[in-house]
A protein has these predicted regions:
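Metal-dependent nuclease catalytic cores that hydrolyze phosphodiester bonds in DNA/RNA
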Residues: 1-140, 247-248, 252
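Short acidic (Asp/Glu) and glycine-rich catalytic loops that position anionic groups and cofactors
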Residues: 33-35, 160-163, 204-209
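Short histidine-centered catalytic/ligand-binding loop motif
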Residues: 41-42, 85-92, 164-174, 216-218
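Hydrophobic/aromatic-lined pockets within catalytic cores
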Residues: 57-61, 158-161, 188, 235, ...
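Secondary-structure boundary elements
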Residues: 113-118, 147-153, 188-195
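Conserved catalytic cores of phosphodiester-cleaving nucleases, focusing on short active-site segments
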Residues: 124, 141-169
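Coil-to-beta-strand transition motifs
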Residues: 136-140, 147-151, 194, 205-208
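Metal-dependent nuclease catalytic regions and adjoining charged, substrate-binding loops involved
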Residues: 170, 174-177, 182-265
Length: 265
């Protein structure tokens, strides 16, 4: 079993490994090989806020988030940022720190989220690596949380709309179904029990409503097939060093079915 726990591998070290991860698969499945090949990993205000909420929920005992000055400008921020980076911690402005705390508190007030995140069996931010035996491609994954005995994978999502309809749209837009299928596939290659994948979704705006969702068995089967087909595309692109879009030179945009009645007039 190829497992490297977070204590043994930092997030930066994980991302430096050249194996294919879930973000790569999501990009290819939802956009193209060209988008994946040309993408640059970015860090931003929103990225830091999301990382802080993850750290507060999954590893609160490590106190990985630092409350910084009012703004990101000036000497005070620069000095604290250098110190935080050295310590492997996340520096936030005063407002963002308070926002992350509010989101964390709201999330933990959700009964299901609290039950999952306070489980003593929770393994947070562990890295897993495997080689797919059929495609011969190196894979990696770093799930937010894993309840090993229960066979449950947890994924924290900070979002604009945690309602059933809103999150359903987000699943389609951002490829969360492919992400879930990929995580489950790599974990199973590592002989890890995986029976379910649960998204813990917390809204960014007050009152930070939180909801938990799972994908249906049919949805996961469909996502698994799509994910495996995407891995084949990635492997072929790597072997041939060809990363195109597969888009036509001249495409035709057709009238959506829901607009047919309008066109009749």
């Amino acid at each position: 079993m190829t497992i490297i726990k977070s204590e043994d591998m930092s997030n930066e070290e994980y991302h430096a490994r050249r194996a294919v991860g879930s973000s790569s698969v999501k990009t290819v499945a939802s956009k193209s090989l060209a988008h994946w090949k040309g993408q640059v990993r970015k860090e931003s205000h929103a990225f830091d806020l999301g990382s802080a909420v993850h750290a507060m929920l999954l590893e609160p005992e490590k106190q990985l988030v630092i409350r910084g000055p009012e703004t990101r400008r000036g000497k005070a921020w620069t000095e604290l940022k250098d110190e935080a980076d050295t310590l492997g911690k996340i520096l936030l402005t005063e407002a963002d720190y308070d926002l992350a705390n509010s989101m964390t508190d709201a999330c933990m007030n959700n009964n299901m989220a609290n039950h999952l995140l306070t489980n003593p069996d929770l393994l947070a931010e562990a890295s897993f690596f495997a080689t797919d035996p059929d495609i011969d491609i190196e894979l990696k994954t770093r799930p937010d949380g894993l309840l090993r005995e229960a066979g449950i994978v947890l994924d924290i999502k900070t979002c604009q709309d945690a309602s059933p309809r809103g999150f359903e749209r987000a699943v389609r837009t951002f490829g969360y179904d492919v992400q879930a299928a990929f995580y489950m596939h790599v974990l199973r290659l590592n002989k890890v029990r995986v029976d379910n994948f649960i998204f813990v979704c917390c809204e960014k705006d007050s009152p930070h409503v939180t909801a938990c969702y799972e994908l249906s068995e049919m949805y996961l089967r469909h996502a698994h097939n799509r994910m495996m087909a995407t891995l084949v595309d990635i492997k072929q692109a790597q072997d041939n060093d060809e990363y195109g879009t597969n888009w036509p030179d001249l495409g035709t945009i057709h009238l959506p079915a829901w607009m047919d009645s309008e066109a009749a007039f």
